[in-house]
């Protein structure tokens, strides 16, 4: 991941992680994860005593029984990484058709026809990476062997000046408790999550759930400054199940017909594995199409570093030049700008800069800029 972020000019922090437990009965789970980590080639992974873990991360509540330490764990801004990969793909000749729903997929004698409300696209191969809807997209052409059920979690984002651990902290849930995750983000915020729930309102939060998250965070990290929350949100992940209702504990890569691949249930650690999955898919495509390696391919992309003296986002110190560069690269909404340069992610959550960014977007669309 570090080398990929370097190529795509995306910030990356290799901070390490601790998976901690306060329950002697859960140590066997850590030992199993240690064995799996060693078998999978995770560098430097080892089991620590409670005293070693507390010395490594003083913010932890005293009483740690054991902890699994993984020094290679890192953090990255997920949407910046995704957008950077998209920009690099465009640099190398890829085309994108955005805001277009797939309504049908059918086979023809030479491959497939992907139908949308506006057009039909004839292709030799289809790669279905539709995330939360991947099973539904495959069902347009072939019966999937797995179905997705969504569950969610609530998240707290703490201000950059809040005290934070130096490592990613995972809490190994005990038999009667719930795990929690605390992530020191590469941007400087602390992200806290882990209260799993079945979905009522997609992407929603509840007062009870957020309070539970506040309480759990303080139990794990007593000095966590949860009063400095600047944002809360809900997120979902796709859990794959077989038709008989059995949970699938791995990624599902389906190949129901020559030239058709579906990636279903790509959840944690999906971001970490995304590049390797992409390389795996590229090898399949090259073999199927008998394609030759593109000698002109350029893996490098330059980040947005344009700056001037006009500050638009006061909280994050984002300049007009940065916002205009994000717009020139394809941002068409305030959220699109936000995910490229970080405007609106600070303490005021965009209350002071949103209208200014909307005006710049409008002027750019009208040709005034």
Where on the chain are the PLM-derived regions?
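Flavin-dependent oxidoreductases
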Residues: 105-110, 114-208, 215, 224, ...
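Helix-loop-beta segment of a Rossmann-like dinucleotide-binding subdomain
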Residues: 9-21, 54-92, 195-200, 261-266
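Short Gly/Ser/Thr- and Asp/Glu-enriched loop/turn motifs at secondary-structure junctions
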Residues: 13-17, 151-153, 341
């Amino acid at each position: 991941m570090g080398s990929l972020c370097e190529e795509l000019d995306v910030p990356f922090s290799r901070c390490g992680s601790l998976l901690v437990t306060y329950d002697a009965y859960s140590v066997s789970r850590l030992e199993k994860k240690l064995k799996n980590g060693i078998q999978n080639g995770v560098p430097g992974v080892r089991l620590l005593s409670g005293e070693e873990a507390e010395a490594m991360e003083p913010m932890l509540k005293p009483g740690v029984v054991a902890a699994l330490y993984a020094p290679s764990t890192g953090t990255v801004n997920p949407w910046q990484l995704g957008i950077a990969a998209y920009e690099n793909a465009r640099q190398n000749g890829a085309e994108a058709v955005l805001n277009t729903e797939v309504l049908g997929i059918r086979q023809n004698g030479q491959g497939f026809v992907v139908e949308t409300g506006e057009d039909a696209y004839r292709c030799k191969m289809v790669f279905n990476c539709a995330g939360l809807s991947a099973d539904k997209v495959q069902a347009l052409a072939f019966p999937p062997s797995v179905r997705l059920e969504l569950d969610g979690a609530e998240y707290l984002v703490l201000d950059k000046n809040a005290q934070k651990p130096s490592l990613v902290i995972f809490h190994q849930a005990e038999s009667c408790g719930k795990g929690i995750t605390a992530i020191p983000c590469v941007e400087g915020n602390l992200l806290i999550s882990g209260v799993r729930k079945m979905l009522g309102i997609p992407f929603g939060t509840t007062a009870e759930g957020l309070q539970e998250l506040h309480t759990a965070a303080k139990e794990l990290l007593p000095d966590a400054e949860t009063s400095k929350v600047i944002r809360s949100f809900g997120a979902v992940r796709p859990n794959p199940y077989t038709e008989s209702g059995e949970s699938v504990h791995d990624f599902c890569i389906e190949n129901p017909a020559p030239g058709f691949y579906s990636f279903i249930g790509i959840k944690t650690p999906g971001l970490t594995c995304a590049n390797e999955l992409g390389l795996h898919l590229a090898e399949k495509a090259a073999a199927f199409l008998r394609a030759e390696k593109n000698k002109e391919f350029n893996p490098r992309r330059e980040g947005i570093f344009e700056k001037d003296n006009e500050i638009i986002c006061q909280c994050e110190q984002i300049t007009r030049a940065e916002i205009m560069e994000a717009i020139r690269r394809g941002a068409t909404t305030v959220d699109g700008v936000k995910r490229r340069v970080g405007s609106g992610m600070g303490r005021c959550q965009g209350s002071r800069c949103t209208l200014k960014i909307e005006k710049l977007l409008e002027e750019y669309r009208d040709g005034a800029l």
